[in-house]
Amino acid sequence: MAFASASNGAVRFTEEQEALVLKSWAIMKDDSANIGHRFFLKIFEVAPSARHLFSFLRNSDVPLEKNPNLKKHAMAVFVMTCEAAAQLRKTGRVTVRDTTIKRLGSTHFKNGVSDTHFEVARFALLETIKDGIPASMWSPEMKNAWGEAYEHLVAAIKEGMKPVALL
Amino acid sequence: MAFASASNGAVRFTEEQEALVLKSWAIMKDDSANIGHRFFLKIFEVAPSARHLFSFLRNSDVPLEKNPNLKKHAMAVFVMTCEAAAQLRKTGRVTVRDTTIKRLGSTHFKNGVSDTHFEVARFALLETIKDGIPASMWSPEMKNAWGEAYEHLVAAIKEGMKPVALL
């Protein structure tokens, strides 16, 4: 599903931002399972209670670090986030697979995900990317490019979280 | 006001934990203004929307880094947090100046501070202390001691956030 920015115009994402995202994603891609896992462990380090938002963690005694469902979920979310960022400029839209953005919106709404949770995930994502690429590649511009791409994804998910107006 | 742990028993805080807190607080104390400021800037780095919880930030155009009210507030909160931690074992209670814990509870309740906000502040506090003491002094035990002291303070504030039952 394609999703335009809140203004309903095309997403603004410069060539330079796209180049930074593509360059760093190319480096991280092959290690998505581990980097995605670290992304989620960072979220839970900052906000331990966020684990209650995930059904497969609520009813599990397995430590977070060893939970296979978390590893699988974390990789899927990380890859989706990075691919949406990588395609942002080309498509001018947040692009994820069909129906996924609707499901994401509804799941996040149902589970009571708050603005602060989205912010914690943003912080965790940027910290994880910083540690996932060579130190010489990290810069304020790189941080900004990923931060903006993430904000576009969140705007799309939040749009999907809005209850449908009843006629 | 003195506040016991949730179990209404004395707070458990070991001699070792107290020693770690006292040792690191002694080093940070003289630089409380700067370290406290960094503590709050870290909170806003992780959760930018948390600035709306503070009346003196909501209506200000001054950048966070330069806001004198934030500097003042941050230092007061940091010193209170560290002093409560330093006195925890000796008193067996979270001890802050008279009426402060009630005011804290009521202010946090009124402004809609959530569990996630308290978690973000915990993460920011631990990161700030890590950077505020010599690297050789930081350890899992040090992190644990400050983390536990902070949890006791938060439990006291949350107790003060509960609406008074009506008879």
Swiss-Prot record, chains A, B:
Binding-site positions, heme b: S55, H73, R103, T107, H108
Cofactor(s), names only, from the UniProt record: heme b
Cofactor: how bound: Binds 1 heme group per subunit.
Main location as per UniProt: cytoplasm
Ranges of residues in domain Globin: 12-162
Entry-linked PROSITE patterns: GLOBIN (PS01033), PLANT_GLOBIN (PS00208)
Chain positions of motif Homodimerization: 45-49, 115-127
Subcellular location(s) of the protein: Cytoplasm; Nucleus
Induction (UniProt): Accumulates upon salt (NaCL), drought, cold and asbcisic acid (ABA) treatment. Induced in nutrient deficient conditions (e.g. Ca(2+) deprivation), but down-regulated in resupply conditions.
EC number of the protein: 1.7.2.-
Any GO BP: response to cold
Annotated site, Homodimerization, chain positions: K143
Keyword Flavoprotein: no
Cysteine-cysteine disulfides: none
Domain of life according to the entry: Eukaryota
Record GO terms (molecular function): heme binding; metal ion binding; oxidoreductase activity; oxygen binding; oxygen carrier activity
Keywords: Cytoplasm, Heme, Iron, Metal-binding, Nucleus, Oxidoreductase, Oxygen transport, Transport
This protein's record includes keyword DNA repair: no
SUPFAM superfamilies for the chain: Globin-like (SSF46458)
Any GO CC annotation of this UniProt entry: cytoplasm
The family this protein is said to belong to: Belongs to the plant globin family.
Assembly and binders: Homodimer.
Function: Phytoglobin that reduces nitrite to nitric oxide under anoxic conditions (e.g. during flooding or in waterlogged soil). May not function as an oxygen storage or transport protein. Has an unusually high affinity for O(2) through an hexacoordinate heme iron because of a very low dissociation constant.
Protein name listed in UniProt: Anaerobic nitrite reductase NSHB4
Organism the protein comes from: Oryza sativa subsp. indica (Rice)
